Amino acid sequence: MFVRMLVFRVLLLIALVGKSVIGLSLMSFIAPPDPDWTPDDYYYSYEQSSPDEDPSVTQTTPENPDWYYEDDDPCQSNPCEHGGDCIIRGDTFSCSCPAPFSGSRCQTAQNKCKDNPCVHGDCLITQKHPYYRCACKYPYTGPDCSKVLPACRPNPCQNGGVCSRHRRRSRFTCACPDQYKGKFCEIGPDDCYVGDGYSYRGKVSKTVNQNPCLYWNSHLLLQETYNMFMEDAETHGIAEHNFCRNPDGDHKPWCFVKVNSEKVKWEYCDVTVCPVPDTPNPVESLLEPVMELPGFESCGKTEVAEHAVKRIYGGFKSTAGKHPWQVSLQTSLPLTTSMPQGHFCGGALIHPCWVLTAAHCTDINTKHLKVVLGDQDLKKTESHEQTFRVEKILKYSQYNERDEIPHNDIALLKLKPVGGHCALESRYVKTVCLPSDPFPSGTECHISGWGVTETGEGSRQLLDAKVKLIANPLCNSRQLYDHTIDDSMICAGNLQKPGSDTCQGDSGGPLTCEKDGTYYVYGIVSWGQECGKKPGVYTQVTKFLNWIKTTMHREAGL
């Protein structure tokens, strides 16, 4: 059933361990990932540049194939990160990077802190000369944190705390009034988190193990997925501070802590949960009128903002809620000896009771199939997940395979309601819109998933990447698919070097394109060859709009 090793997508090149990044190639099968996936510690390495080259301007090379898509303006999407300026150079581009960033896309930061210029403080990366500053540990001060002040003059304790000096001039203790805590009595009774703590904006900066948190722009975090320079950092409350946050939708706030001069790890924070408000009297609740559950207000909207400067950032752990229409198809029985039970394909939620996926993912009995919405970590049962059984599988009638290539590779899954309803809208679960018009070639779109196909393992964390739509005549060229692409298919790939970023996603998962702040499911991950070297092939959703709408109307009375 699922044995298409050479054709269907092997869709993972980068996987995440905890909150650190490791490389993983499904083609090697050298070392399977640890089934427990405990967070690994990360060693920071420094990038050296040759003295006779300008690291701030890097041109693309022949290894970056410019034949991947037709685009008159390679700078249209601004592929340069961290505020870099894109410069057109013939058919390609280069990035002029603001200090201290360098690299072909300004993705690397020069480490001004490697010689430890801060004697009694933390060295932080900044974007203004000299591109670092010292955050001194009180009572030390000065540009290099070498000067010490009287510990209790002036009183550093907040909220009425009383400062007591120790024998050593730099040591002191704050005696805090009731309901206040922290080194400076800065944490008040209202400093708590609700739910999973995604919205927490308090000032706790210690972990459950009483380790101090690193600043989010610490030089030790430059290569971490989550730092002050990440995409939409401000949206997640991340800035130049060391307060606990939860940008990835974990079950409580966390932060990075220092292990040694080059090594960090992450730990959960010592933050209290906000008290639950009093519930109404049960008798009174019974007297309230029964209200129908509201439907989804709109489609294609995410509550996670993007920076104005777009990034091509494939292979990173996706921010929780960034792809709220992403679906995980899971089986209760092993499909093959190499494909155990659990996640095996992706999908897209297009209506509270309907999931769009690839037809080649549906050769399975509905009694062994379940759909999980809002999933971020496959190894955890997260509080915001919603799980449903499948009432019916409806494949497109003309789906077929010729020479191991799927044609008209599309199917609908009708969800079985739970408690009288299907999916409930939340920050983590939303529907994606169906497109009404085609997007032009060169449009930058999104793929997401856990990097799993029918033939291999993948990431436990949801990954995402950006790809560009490729004109079918170009995709049918001899260098690519040599006239095997029909009008039910669409190709998409990146200007990345071969072997990176073009295989993030799952069979059946969505290819979404954005217009005016709304996301549309424009393709369904279908198949591909030479992962990372050739673009992916997707079912073109616009070719099947009439079938989708007719089927949903007939089956559900929409």
Swiss-Prot record:
Designated gene of the protein: Habp2
Post-translational modifications reported in the UniProt record: Proteolytic cleavage at Gly-23 or Met-27 can give rise to the 50 kDa heavy chain (HC) and cleavage at Arg-311 or Lys-317 can give rise to the 27 kDa light chain (LC). The HC can undergo further proteolytic cleavage giving rise to a 26 kDa fragment. The LC can undergo further proteolytic cleavage at Arg-311 leading to a 17-kDa fragment and at Arg-478 leading to a 8-kDa fragment.
Protein name: Factor VII-activating protease
Similarity remark: Belongs to the peptidase S1 family.
Organism: Mus musculus (Mouse)
EC numbers for this chain: 3.4.21.-
Gene Ontology cellular component terms for the protein in this record: extracellular region
Signal peptide as annotated in the record: 1-23
GO biological process: proteolysis
Localization of this protein: Secreted
